[in-house]
């Protein structure tokens, strides 16, 4: 089958073949980072370790201030060095077991743990940032091959919400559900910039999953949601839908990654509604599509068997300002052994 993501990279002019479905990432490849000063962080880490069988040597303990949305570059650099010193060589990915902080100066905390703090991944105003070496990569061992460890937060509006998100991720493995990807063409011109890709996504990936392009601001009462991509400040009626285990949903807007902000809808609302992962920016990104997930890449890679953290991370070209939250090991389309 023609590979959509390659076509996008070269302005839809080249073709390639999608890879065979892959096996899910393993517990030995994931490390959980715990903030020992945060009681909820300790509980989340313990719950996730048990649910996913993460080895004890992959439990990394740090100390950070509790309750702050952001930490500074200097403090983060100290913490990051401690994390690197505790990380076994087999680890390819980090699961960050807390909801705050979610920002490091001008970077998201997931990007800071992935790349190390680097102002090349930041931007003041409407400017590009450094491209991720992981973007649309076929790497299965990012630490070994690219010297990065993609990171995802185990975060939520409440402790019980985080537990539920983890449970949905575990339940997703090998499910191969009858599902739909919903691509919303909204009335918000500034935030609807991804919609130009929708026709070719639908044309090329409909054999892998049912895809519906919906010309509306609201999707409601659907019972088969695996993907929901839209562009709005606030998305109504999301709780009316049934999100299948492993579902990915996000809304392209400026501050969705401000987890507890009120100016715009937080990405946590998707998780409250039943999604297993979402994405949002922590710093004003402007409407660069490169700073948000490319729906075609996510859909293609996820339905071809990659884990959630792989497919989602690989879909963002400029992720420095973007926050990934979800259950990283969820693999609804992976081959099970």
Residue ranges, per PLM feature:
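Cysteine-dependent hydrolase recognition
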Residues: 24-337
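Bacterial N-terminal signal peptides that target proteins for export
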Residues: 1-9
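N-terminal signal peptide c-region/cleavage motif recognized by signal peptidases
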Residues: 16-18
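Cleavable N-terminal signal peptides
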Residues: 10-11, 21
């Amino acid at each position: 089958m023609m590979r959509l993501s390659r076509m996008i990279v070269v302005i839809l002019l080249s073709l390639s073949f999608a890879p065979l479905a892959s096996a899910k990432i393993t517990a030995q490849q994931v490390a959980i980072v715990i903030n020992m000063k945060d009681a909820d962080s300790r509980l989340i880490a313990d719950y996730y370790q048990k649910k996913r069988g993460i080895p004890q040597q992959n439990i990394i303990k740090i100390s950070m201030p509790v309750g702050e949305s952001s930490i500074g570059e200097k403090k983060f650099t100290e913490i990051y060095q401690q994390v690197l010193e505790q990380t076994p060589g087999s680890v390819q990915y980090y699961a960050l077991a807390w909801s705050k902080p979610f920002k490091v100066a001008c970077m998201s905390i997931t990007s800071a743990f992935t790349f190390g703090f680097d102002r090349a991944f930041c931007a003041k105003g409407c400017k590009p940032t450094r491209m991720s070496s992981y973007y649309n990569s076929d790497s299965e061992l990012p630490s070994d091959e690219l010297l990065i460890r993609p990171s995802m937060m185990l975060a939520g509006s409440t402790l019980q919400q985080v537990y539920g998100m983890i449970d949905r991720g575990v339940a997703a493995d090998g499910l191969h559900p009858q599902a739909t990807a919903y691509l919303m063409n909204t009335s918000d011109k500034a935030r609807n910039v991804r919609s130009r890709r929708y026709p070719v996504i639908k044309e090329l990936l409909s054999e892998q999953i049912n895809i519906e392009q919906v010309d509306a601001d609201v999707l409601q009462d659907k019972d088969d949601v695996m993907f929901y991509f839209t562009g709005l400040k606030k998305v109504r009626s999301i709780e009316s839908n049934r999100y299948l285990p492993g579902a990915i949903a996000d809304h392209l807007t400026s501050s969705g990654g401000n987890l507890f902000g009120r100016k715009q809808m937080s990405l946590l609302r998707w998780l409250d509604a039943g999604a297993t992962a979402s994405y949002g920016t922590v710093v004003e990104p402007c409407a660069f599509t490169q700073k948000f997930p490319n729906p075609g890449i996510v859909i293609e890679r996820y339905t071809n068997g990659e884990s959630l953290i792989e497919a989602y991370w690989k879909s963002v070209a400029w992720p420095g300002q973007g926050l990934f939250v979800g259950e990283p090991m969820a693999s609804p389309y992976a081959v099970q052994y």
